[in-house]
Amino acid sequence: MSSNNGDVRLWGARFADGPAEALAKLSASVHFDWRLAPYDIAGSRAHARVLSKAGLLSEDELTRMLAGLDQLEADVADGSFTGTIADEDVHTALERGLLERLGADLGGKLRAGRSRNDQIATLFRMYLRDHARTIGGLIADLQSALVGLAEAHADVAMPGRTHLQHAQPVLFAHHVLAHVQSLSRDAERLRQWDERTAVSPYGSGALAGSSLGLDPQAVAADLGFERGSVANSIDGTASRDFVAEFAFITAMIGVNLSRIAEEVIIWNTKEFSFVTLHDAFSTGSSIMPQKKNPDIAELARGKSGRLIGNLTGLLATLKALPLAYNRDLQEDKEPVFDSCDQLEVLLPAFTGMMATLTVNRERMEELAPAGFSLATDIAEWLVKQGVPFRVAHEVAGACVKECERAGIELDQLTDEQFAEISEHLTPEVRTVLNVRGALASRDGRGGTAPSAVAVQLAEVKEDLAAQHAWATARP
């Protein structure tokens, strides 16, 4: 099909001269907004139907219009029709394509009652709603991999840390499920965002609506916007908070991935040796033959900064725009397009890394009680004996001090040493000076006891089933 670049600009009748070449280059967006073409065509179909309903297209014209749009869609899909810089944007390129297929008399009727302002606000929502589900599904895949990791190592103890220092023993599964929870909130944010975004600006025109008797609600229903059309046409064309919110969610996903990545990088070092990465998800060095690098985790850290940058750049663009539409809003698309692209490449690789890593159980359990991490258990044992916690805390601290002086661990203190530290420290205190006992004692909701972690696993699996169902459904 011909891609003749005749001048079909959607503006210009009141200008004596065409745009300067420098302006045309600056103004062009078709090189990045062409990905919206399928949504633009879907919007055109819905618009053609309301034009017909309003008596502005005959039944025969509607039939031919829809056939022309079907042909244009097929030509876009197979690459035989593409936009060029001369088209300025995706809307103009597709209008050119429609005119080539239907002629100006019929093809030119589609412009009635719509503006690029309401078009782009609608198409952008449609695009992001689809990609929200794609990303949500990829998050669910990662969560499933993490759940599998937790289940396969359900009884492995490890040192829990605060300030990156030994704190208290926890189950490895408990630690992994903490990351699953943060990702669950990311997925929930996507679902809540989608619900808010399910309103269509189509029919808002440039800003004031249309006088042609068109039905915005019919277009909204046709395009899968469950909440109908926007309540205010100015807001519909001018607001991009839905874009900023989406950019925040993707940035938050990046931050949460980066936190997991940082731990994987640390755990994979010789000094920690908590995990070993699979060869298929590691890289080597061009000069050091022994190297096995955690590149996926490092790229996740780097890309999180990129996602944050996309958000901050977008907010800076939006911060001072008066109502209604301003051309600044051309700059709203590339940041979030990039955020989608980055996550849709990163998440599968990250999931593969987590699903295939080897957990070094012996090393984790060796270090679980290290660093006097059972000191809190001594304090809590004393509390159960009726000792005020302030006193119990001081006594446990004195035990740590004595161990540091003697170069031993807490469970190596003798009965005599315990008695010298405090009269409350009877030999029975030894019942809590073991990792398994410390873990089992923390059996409240959300705790690290095996029984509590089993409940967390069951709840996460239930949530994941709902998340997968949402991700595979399309509006």
From Swiss-Prot:
Catalytic reactions on record: 2-(N(omega)-L-arginino)succinate = fumarate + L-arginine
Gene Ontology MF: a single term: argininosuccinate lyase activity
Record localization: Cytoplasm
GO cellular component: cytosol
A Pfam family assignment: Lyase_1
Pathway recorded for this protein: Amino-acid biosynthesis; L-arginine biosynthesis; L-arginine from L-ornithine and carbamoyl phosphate: step 3/3
Keyword field: Amino-acid biosynthesis, Arginine biosynthesis, Cytoplasm, Lyase
Main localization of the protein described in the UniProt heading: cytoplasm
One GO term of the biological process aspect: L-arginine biosynthetic process
Annotated EC: 4.3.2.1
NCBIfam families: argH
Family listed: Belongs to the lyase 1 family. Argininosuccinate lyase subfamily.
Name assigned to this protein: Argininosuccinate lyase
Organism, as annotated: Streptomyces griseus subsp. griseus (strain JCM 4626 / CBS 651.72 / NBRC 13350 / KCC S-0626 / ISP 5235)
